[in-house]
Each structure stands twice: as C-alpha cells, then as structure tokens.
Amino acid sequence: MNVHILLTQSIPCHRLSLVLNSDTASRPAVRPVPTTGAAPAARWSRARWLLLFATCIVIALDGLDVSMVGVALPSIGKDLGLQAGALQWIVSGYVLGYGSLLLLGGRLADLLGRRTVLLVALSVFTVASLAGGLSMDAGLLIASRFVKGVAAAFTAPAAFSLITTNFEEGPERNKAISIFTTFAASGFSLGLIMSGLMTSLSWRWTFLFSVPLAILALVLGFFFVPKDARERGAGHDVVGAILLAAGMLLLVYTVVSAPGAGWGSLPTVLGFVVAGALLTAFVILELRVRHPLIRFGIFRVAAVLRANLTAITLFGSYVSFQFVLTLYLQDVLGWSPLGMALALLPTGLVVVTSAPFADRLIDRFGPTVLIIVGLGSLSAGYLLFLRLGTAPVYWLDVLPPVVLLGIGFGIGFPAIQVQATTGVHDDEQGLAAGLVQTSAQVGGALALAVTTALIAGGPAAVGGHDPAGLAEQLAQYRPGLYLSAGLALAGLLIAALPRRRRLAVQPG
C-alpha cells in the first residue's frame, strides 16, 4: 500500500492527515458511492454491501493463495515427481510475482482506474488458477503460480483502494476496513485448513478452488463496482516503475534462491549488488522526476513508517511460523493433512470472530494500541510453541498458542491497515494500499527464505523424515520458531516506541 503527508495524530485514534503534492488540487476526485455522512454499516445500501463483498472475495483469494499450497507440497511432489528444490518454487513463484509488483499495481490502479485494473487482473488470476489445477508438469505449474502472484499484485491494492475511496474516513471506513481485513486474515489463516481438507481428495483442488470464487467476484465487480475517475495531467513514471519492479523482483528472487545457492556464492552476491543498484537508481529518479511513483516524503510521518515496519514483522513472523508448523506437524508428528487442518481450525475461527470487533476497538483506543496488543499476542503464541516436544498434548500444548495467534492476527492486521492509510487523498489510496501490502509480502518472502536457511534440513525436509530421530528433527526447526518470535517482538518494540504528538511535513 502507499502513502502521503501531513500528520495530525488525534488523541483517540492517532489519525493521519496528509498534505499532498502542490498539484493535488487540480486532480479529479474519485466519485464515491453516494453515502449519508458517516452512516453506520447497517444503513448501507444493497449496492454498497455488494461492492464491499466483491472486494472481500478478492482479498480472501489473495490470502488463500499465499498459504494454501504449503500443505499440498508433498502430494504435488509425489504426483509430478518433483524434488524439494522444485517444490519450493511453487511457493516462492507466487511470492515473487506478488511482492515485486504490488507498488506498481497500486499506482496503476490510481492511474488507469481501480475498476478496470481489478477486473482485468482478476480475469488473469482466474485463468492462471485453472491452468495451475490442470498442470501436468512442474514448469507450467510454477509459471501459473507466478502469473497468479502478478495478478494478485494488482487486485489487492485495487480492491483495498476501492474500500478507502468509497467509504468516508472515520467510523464508516473503519467498519468497512474491519470487514475487509477480516476476509483477508481469514483467507490467509483458513488457507492451511482448506488445503488440508482438499489435499485428502487431490492437490489439484487447492488450485481449482479459487476458480468459482474468482468468477463470482468478477460478476459482482462488473455490476456493482462503480467507475472511478482516472488521474489525469500527471506523468506515469514508466522508467521508475520498471526500475522498482526489476529491483524488487531480483531482490526477492535472490533471497529465495540464496539458501540453495549459498549466501556467499557469486550468483547470490551478484544478485544483491544488481538489485541494490536498480533500487538505488529508482530512489534517485524518484527524487528528481516531477510526478514520482512514490513520494518519499511520506516516510517522514512516524505513523506511516511505523505501520509499514510492523507490517513487515507481523506478516514475516506469521509466514515463517506457518512454514515451520507445517513441517513440524507432518514430518515430526506424522499428522495427515486433514489432521493438521483440524488442529489449526481454532486459529481461523478466532480470526473470524475477533477481526470484526477491530473497528470498534480502533475507534475507542486507536490503531497503535491494537497493533501492540496484536503483536504481543503473536509473540506470546510463538514463545509458547518453543516448549513443544515430540509428543505434545493438543489441549495443553497446541491449542493455547493457536488461539493467541488468531487473536493477534485478527486485531493486529486491521489496525495496521487503518494506521497506514488514514488521511491519504483519494487519488493515492491505491499507492497507500500497495505500500503496506508490499511491506507485508516482502517481509513474508524474506522471512520464509531466511527460515529455510536457518532450519538444518531446509526445504529438503519437505516430504521426508530425519533418520536421526524425531527429537533431532524438532531441534532443526527451532531456529525458525526463534525467528518468528524475534520478528514479532521487534514489531512490538517498534509499535510501542514513543511518538511525536504532531508533525507537519510540507509536500514536495
């Protein structure tokens, strides 16, 4: 997601009000669905609810695809004859497409129209899902995952900016964002559960499951997503977009490849150097062009910077933990995919039941308090998992931390979204959405890559048992749990840092 700047942190909600570039006044305003002030959600029209539902399906699909494939990897490898190295790219291919193009997707949503970008990208996502489910070889399967990630990089910020431009800032928008992020959090959390259930039938259903949902979102979007004005009179900064996408793509690719190639190998070092050069060139260009893709002045706002940093730590810790948990339950305990799905069911249920209350809590306490509570719950959950052995008692050893993780993600993620986008002008809501989403996805990609390097077996652990014994194998996974706990605690520290009460930054 993406952002802009004058900061006014009001006492109850620590709101952000941003001063835009000097040419903002000449930009056309996006026409929202008619609303009566800050009317409560109960009085929203049928069209308003269907607009919200369409965007919620989109973001739930994005969340599902991030987490859903993990449980199916052993079955995919057995069916297609793939080794662990190839299996890793089924996961990382999606992350590469998603994490490297989110900012570009958010900006294009502003420039080309959110409705247009959403419908086109969602159509591509649907076709790629179908191709993945019908794939008979690894190349097509990995390619379809990459294309789905690229499509999701455009659907996610477009969907979120449709929320922020069609619901007025305040209780109305907080309510809509709470519902929206409930679907996002639930989609991500329920991805492992659905994958466990469907893998018992066939791994292909973990890919085909998205097709009917995507078609439903397309139909609703076509009829109920209003046409919005495009930003006119501003350059598209095509060179900047190319530099950013290329730099991010190479950076994520290098991080994902490093565990296999070696962190000190020539390809890895060269990849980091070239990626750094591309991103440095992007920053220099953005500081000089008249209409930049990103106005870096927004990072002078403490709340915006804090929201993006906590997004990195929250999502990174969660992705890392789910990866380790999948290996722990299947490789150490020998659980079936269905058994793992049932064990994780409380997480999804807690997310679904806690996230809807986030908007009320944000209105009362402000997003910062909710972020602190959320990251605190996640930290406690990860630390509790560190005491697990090879024969845990589910009700005593697994269920309590699972519930804490659901609470932490369910209230922490909506609060981060609100903090990062409040006060952003309509024509840059897509950018604001893209910046936070990019932070979250890049955090997840980096954490996953580091996790595979930290655990002794790495990706090779998928699909096989360590002959040295269950205890030794469990010890191999503990560094991944330490990483998750460390990231969550770092995010908690960032969220709790003292903040300035008022800061104004002039545009430019």
Which residues are covered by each model-predicted region?
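Flexible interhelical linker loops that connect adjacent transmembrane helices
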Residues: A42, L218-A245, L287-A302, D363-R364, ...
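12-transmembrane solute porter fold
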Residues: R48-I57, L61-L64, V69-V71, W205, ...
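Helix-loop interface residues and adjacent transmembrane-helix termini in multi-pass membrane transporters
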Residues: G81, L111, L134-S135, G170, ...
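Glycine/proline-centered helix-kink
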Residues: P157, A185-G196, M248, F323, ...
